[in-house]
Amino acid sequence: MMKNKLFIFINVFGMALAIACCIVAYFAYEYQATFDGNHTNASQIYRVSAIREFDNEVTRWGYGPLPLGGIVEQNFKDVDKSSRYHFSYSNFKRENDLFESNLSYVDPEFFEMFSFEFIKGDPKALKDVSSVFISDKMADRLFGSPEEAFGKTITQVYRTNLKEIKIAGVFKEQPQNSSFHSRDAFMNFENCKDEHVASTDDNWTQEATLFIQVNDPSRVSAIHKQLQPYIENNNKVREDFIIKELALDHFPTMAVNDQAAFVRSWTWSAPPPAAIVGSAVMGILILLIACFNLTNTAIAISSRRLKEIGIRKVMGGLRKQLIVQFIGETTLICFFAVLLGLVFGEFLTEGWNTMWPYMRVTPHYLDNPQFLIFMAVILIFTGLLAGAYPAFYISNFEPISILKGKLKFGGTNYFTRILLGLQFAISLIAIVSAIAFLQNANYQKEYDLGFDAKGSVIAWLDSKEEFETYRNSLQSNPQIISMAGAASGIFSNRVNEPVKHESKEVEVDIIDVGDHYLKTMNLTLLEGRDFVQDSETDKRESIIISQKMATMFGWEKPLGKEVIWKDTTKLYVVGVVKDVHTMGLWRSLEPLMIRYIGPEKYSQIVVNAKEANVPGLNKFMEAKWKEIFPNRLYNGYMLVENTDEVDNVNGNIVKMYSFLGVIALMLSATGLFTLVSLNIIRRTKEIGVRKVLGASIGNITRIINTEFVVILSLASIAGSVFSYFAVDLLMDSIWDYYLSTTTQTFMISIAIMFVVSAAVIGYKVFTAASLNPVNTLRDE
């Protein structure tokens, strides 16, 4: 080993990087596997979810009818505990300082069901409707410490209402892999009625999440059956929300399933599959490349140890002793790589965390027995995978053949060529993936969503008077192109409900907008007209639809067509707009129906300006807000923030595959460097003889490089074919609208691989070809 320090160091470094990737993958998996594991009663808790089916598509909702909470508490004897849950936001005031915080409304048994670590206070005080429980993070923000916050009185500000509430407890913030992470304030559910006047116990038009605790799992099936009759109560009054089944979601797997099925809920979902599967794929691929590297190096180095092996076998050495020695040496290399990998893992996890802002992977080694077992398995696996073939193959040679010099083993044989080809094929797949997602990111960034996402700012208001006052204050800004009011709009509060035309029923996105909304959001009117200002007829019966809605109903001439909404309301098409992606590219294009409303129903203002002026406009709107509404925090936001998430996901995937590509290519290139170097050493005399016979440097370079060029070419073909299907399959699982791989994608990727390979081995080959044959043949 000591005679080959450079090659051993290269392999230790490469293996350490691979093991560091496996460490990230392990803790990413642990993060998801232990999601909500901090709750002692997790295995006994279930969420009541609503299952809907429309047009043969089944969807799951993480909440159900509000009255179910009271019904279950009073009538379901098999349920041991229950709590409703509603998530909202509120402003809190301490003296003259105003703070915004999320706020969860729950029933008194909530803290008995879920595990919260209380620093101060008694969770039983949740029965008091005038109390609030806050996290230690919120306590630090308001008062500097949990001890200072406990027992203090703060003011809840909701619209124009002020309510004095007492801080009855301070709890430690939930871990990041918890459904209730970053939930900073909890109040008794009865307070929800102050925010939502319609939230009465018998109002089936309102929703809430309902959690139940069932200590005896054999009773769950009976509870599920007992829930089903109440579906009818909902469906009688909610034609827009017809439920097929009330299901029970087991809490330990709820967050993971919510993420997989895109369930709408008020709790945190588990990380996206790309964060878990991506890290695992990255770790496995890089580990395989590192193992192939070490195997190739061991095979190549063995050509310089054949005489040692022959002499040991002549002197009575047993084959199993040689096997143990070879595998032991390889395992020792892997052991040093594990130690270095633990160090690299600390840095790599920090980089991984920056890619997924809602996921915090924290490595912890010595206090984690499962991790230590995992590392032991990695050590044994890599030692055997990298060392088994050289050990068993070389130890099987006959000593007579070795000592007579009949064996020409080492350099590159069929096995090493296959391993090297696999390394570069994997590297190419990673490079293609990175470039393809980068191209897709640019494509989606410029994708026409059907509205102006980059030039709009939205703020929420509570009344017609507030809207008019705020709008008038903004009119002095010359950068504003247009303003409009709405109750619901694109990316904000839209609903999805069925409408009928004759015998056909279609579920459509519905938004309620006021004057100038089409102009402000830059919606393109293709046919018909916009709404007439202050027209009572338009408010009552006119709609503007998207192309998609016209297509789904099969209308070639949609103007004047009648649809029925909520079984009784007749609406008539007066205009058609270009298709609008109301939720960006996260889901397939949905049909859109736009209704006209008056200022008395406005709950938001939409302001449009040139893209370059939007950040400044947002600051201007915030300044005006503080003047007009001093007791409320500014709630405006740039609409582009909603579409930025698409860019972030694309960016994270590009980073992940770029990292994989760089590491894989680097490891493959070092493996190529090792093989070329050892091959040159083995062929030094051959090179000298060729030069004596008149071979030029170019000829010798071509002879040495030919087999490696062939290997890279075959790897390019294999990697291109596999990545063509794999990358498209991956993109299709994430997006409905994406840019497939192109010829340019593969040309750039293959060029990168060849250029890097040439740069790595070019100097080494040229130096060998330039050697003076007198020096190389001196011993002959």
Where do the protein language model's features map onto the residues?
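Membrane-proximal extracellular/periplasmic loop immediately following the first transmembrane helix
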Residues: 25-91, 194, 199-211, 217, ...
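Hydrophobic alpha-helical transmembrane segments of multi-pass inner-membrane transport and secretion
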Residues: 3-30, 270-307, 334-335, 339, ...
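Generic structural signal for small/hydrophobic residues in well-ordered secondary structure
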Residues: 11, 32, 48, 72, ...
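Small-residue-rich transmembrane alpha-helices
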Residues: 24, 247-249, 331-397, 439, ...
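Mid-to-C-terminal secondary-structure elements
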Residues: 107-120, 132-271, 472-646
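Membrane-helix entry/capping segments
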Residues: 3-7, 39, 230-283, 303-304, ...
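Intracellular coupling helices
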Residues: 1-10, 14, 292-333, 396-407, ...
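Hydrophobic alpha-helices of bacterial signal-transduction systems
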Residues: 136-137, 184-185, 190-192, 201-204, ...
